[in-house]
Swiss-Prot record:
Main location: virion
Stated name of the protein: Occlusion-derived virus envelope protein E56
Lineage, broadest ranks: Viruses, Viruses incertae sedis, Naldaviricetes, Lefavirales, Baculoviridae
Gene (name only): odv-e56
Gene source species: Heliothis zea nuclear polyhedrosis virus
Family per similarity comment: Belongs to the baculoviridae E56 family.
Gene Ontology terms: cellular component: membrane; viral envelope; virion membrane
């Protein structure tokens, strides 16, 4: 499901917020993967803009590298002077618009806490750096193995001492 969730979404809260119905706002989504539209509920209309020409111009001049988001006019918390800001005050209570960024492999690595393995200072890059000597390439792996072996050794010592201690004498019960 990676890369399938990105876009501008209209959310309607139901049953006091217990349920939420969401649909994709096609014209506010500037990077749209048309191959995944079958997996997404597309809104039949925009809740704030009725004019189709105005809707079609929302993403006009969009530049992904500069804007660093896949949506326009979809974030009520953005700077009001930015292209991402939307005023949701005309919407009914329990209704909102939000931008959901696509989920990619980098996000998955970060969520799993494996980001220390990547990057210039990451374990994988250090072990595959072509300008390093063989020892420098193997050093991170040796350190990790050393730590694992140390933990196993300490566990062995603790368990061995516990097994060598005699059991405590039975308690005398006065009846």
């Amino acid at each position: 499901a990676l890369r399938r969730t990105g876009g501008s979404y209209y959310h309607i809260g139901l049953n006091g917020g217990e349920q939420v119905e969401s649909c994709l706002l096609r014209y506010r989504t500037c990077v749209l993967d048309v191959n995944n539209l079958n997996d997404v509920n597309v809104c039949p209309s925009d809740p704030l803009i009725d004019n189709i020409n105005a809707l079609q111009s929302v993403c006009h001049g969009y530049n992904a590298e500069v804007e660093r988001t896949v949506c326009r006019r979809s974030d009520p918390n953005a700077d009001p002077l930015s292209l991402q800001y939307v005023d949701i005050s005309p919407l009914a209570t329990g209704h909102t618009i939000s931008c959901i960024e696509p989920y990619d492999f980098g996000d998955l690595i970060g969520d799993l806490g494996l980001d220390g393995l990547l990057g210039e200072e990451g374990l994988l890059n250090k072990s595959s750096d072509k300008s390093s000597t063989s020892f420098q390439k193997l050093l991170p792996i040796i350190v990790v193995l050393g730590i694992v072996l140390l933990i196993i050794f300490i566990g062995y010592i603790v368990i061995k001492r516990m097994l060598m201690q005699p059991p405590p004498p039975p308690a005398n019960y006065n009846r």
